[in-house]
UniProtKB/Swiss-Prot annotation:
<dbReference type="GO" id="GO:0003735">
    <property type="term" value="F:structural constituent of ribosome"/>
</dbReference>
<dbReference type="GO" id="GO:0030686">
    <property type="term" value="C:90S preribosome"/>
</dbReference>
<keyword id="KW-0007">Acetylation</keyword>
<dbReference type="GO" id="GO:0042274">
    <property type="term" value="P:ribosomal small subunit biogenesis"/>
</dbReference>
<dbReference type="GO" id="GO:0006412">
    <property type="term" value="P:translation"/>
</dbReference>
<comment type="similarity">
    <text>Belongs to the eukaryotic ribosomal protein eS7 family.</text>
</comment>
<dbReference type="GO" id="GO:0006364">
    <property type="term" value="P:rRNA processing"/>
</dbReference>
<dbReference type="GO" id="GO:0022627">
    <property type="term" value="C:cytosolic small ribosomal subunit"/>
</dbReference>
<feature type="modified residue" description="N-acetylmethionine">
    <location>
        <position position="1"/>
    </location>
</feature>
<keyword id="KW-0689">Ribosomal protein</keyword>
<keyword id="KW-0687">Ribonucleoprotein</keyword>
<dbReference type="Pfam" id="PF01251">
    <property type="entry name" value="Ribosomal_S7e"/>
</dbReference>
<dbReference type="GO" id="GO:0032040">
    <property type="term" value="C:small-subunit processome"/>
</dbReference>
<dbReference type="InterPro" id="IPR047861">
    <property type="entry name" value="Ribosomal_eS7_CS"/>
</dbReference>
<dbReference type="GO" id="GO:0003729">
    <property type="term" value="F:mRNA binding"/>
</dbReference>
<protein>
    <recommendedName>
        <fullName>Small ribosomal subunit protein eS7</fullName>
    </recommendedName>
</protein>
<dbReference type="InterPro" id="IPR000554">
    <property type="entry name" value="Ribosomal_eS7"/>
</dbReference>
Amino acid sequence: MFSAQNKIHKDKGVAPTEFEERVAQAFFDLENTNQELKSDLKDLYINQAVSMDIAGNRKAVVIYVPFRLRKAFRKIHSRLVRELEKKFSGNDVIFVATRRIMRPPKKGSAVQRPRNRTLTSVHEAMLEDVAYPAEIVGKRTRYRVDGTKIMKVYLEPKERNNTEYKLETMVGVYRKLTGKDVVFEYPVADP
């Protein structure tokens, strides 16, 4: 019969961790108990789940979903996040699509690498995933006097009430995933 094991597909030969099994079980329970999510969750599964400690005594649950299923997850994102945050006692839940980064081709090699496999492209796509459901409406890179870079990301003001409470978590998760500093802001509307 169906079980929580069907909700997590890892690479060959890798067993899921205890935390990943808890997340898969939460997905399975939601599919069986929540009628409005049942049909949407039927064919969905995850690749990996990680619990991250964020500064300020907060925790985040980062769930990696297959790249091909990210659109299906985005359709039910707000309802799914709300239910999973209840199950994980207030931890912020963030969905990120699994993407691969390829090395640059060697000199003299005729091999081309796709744009979506470059480090820059993968990091930009991760930024969009972390900021979802808010859309990114602008970016500024600020270079400090000491040479460090910080990226300011402006989010869609319409989604402010859905994302404002987890801005710190989004900053911490993006820093842990990519090693880059980022600040999320909402653009000030001109009166």
